[in-house]
Regions:
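Short, conserved "switch-loop" micro-motifs in signal-transduction and mechanochemical regulators
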Residues: 90-91
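Short amphipathic alpha-helix used as the core "switch/output" element in two-component signaling
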Residues: 63-81
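Receiver (REC) domain switch/output surface
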Residues: 117-129
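C-terminal single-pass membrane-anchor helix
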Residues: 134-166
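Active-site beta3 strand of CheY-like receiver
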Residues: 47-58
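Conserved acidic segment of CheY-like receiver
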Residues: 2-23, 34-41, 51-52
Length: 166
């Protein structure tokens, strides 16, 4: 597994620290950064995050700050290659659906099982990436084989036309 750079963006410092501790214990090769606002997250994109764990609200520190949903929309417009896992205290299906529609890979409800669910979301994400990688590899192989077959057919036609084969 490549070294992942993970941003945890959560305005609840205790929850962010617990999330960092949990992820660091499960994935010791991850480089993890914590931010309390979407703006801080955006200001640190030069660290090239591969995954962002993003709180839905983000309004405890600064009421005028960008919400988690607004941050998600901004990230997906500007950095579509970054995978985002949303976390929220809201156990509402419409909120989860909205986040996924806006580009979140998964949605985790804060609570007793949040850390395990986040870990499961990471594992699902890694499997998804592997499938995407395999698909790209097979598409490339398919193109190569297609061009090889076309080349063989063209050579056979040339050989027939020149009388090399009957």
């Amino acid at each position: 597994m490549n070294k992942e750079v993970v941003f945890i963006v959560d305005d609840e410092p205790m929850h962010a620290q617990m999330m960092e501790d949990h992820l660091a214990s499960k994935y010791p090769n991850f480089k993890i950064y914590k931010y309390s606002t979407g703006e801080e997250c955006n200001d640190n994109m030069d660290k090239h995050p591969t995954i962002v764990v993003l709180d839905y609200h983000l309004d405890a520190v600064n009421k005028s700050a960008r919400t988690g949903l607004e941050t998600l929309i901004h990230l997906k417009k500007k950095y579509d290659h970054i995978d985002v896992i949303m976390i929220s205290g809201q156990d509402k299906i419409d909120v989860a659906v909205e986040c996924v529609r806006e580009g979140a890979f998964d949605y985790v409800v804060k609570g007793p099982s949040a850390f395990v669910r986040t870990e499961q979301a990471f594992e699902k994400l890694f499997k998804h990436r592997q499938v995407i990688h395999e698909l790209a590899k097979y598409k490339k192989l398919n193109r190569t084989l297609t061009f090889s077959i076309i080349g063989i057919i063209a050579l056979a036609a040339i050989f027939r036309a020149t009388g090399i084969i009957g």
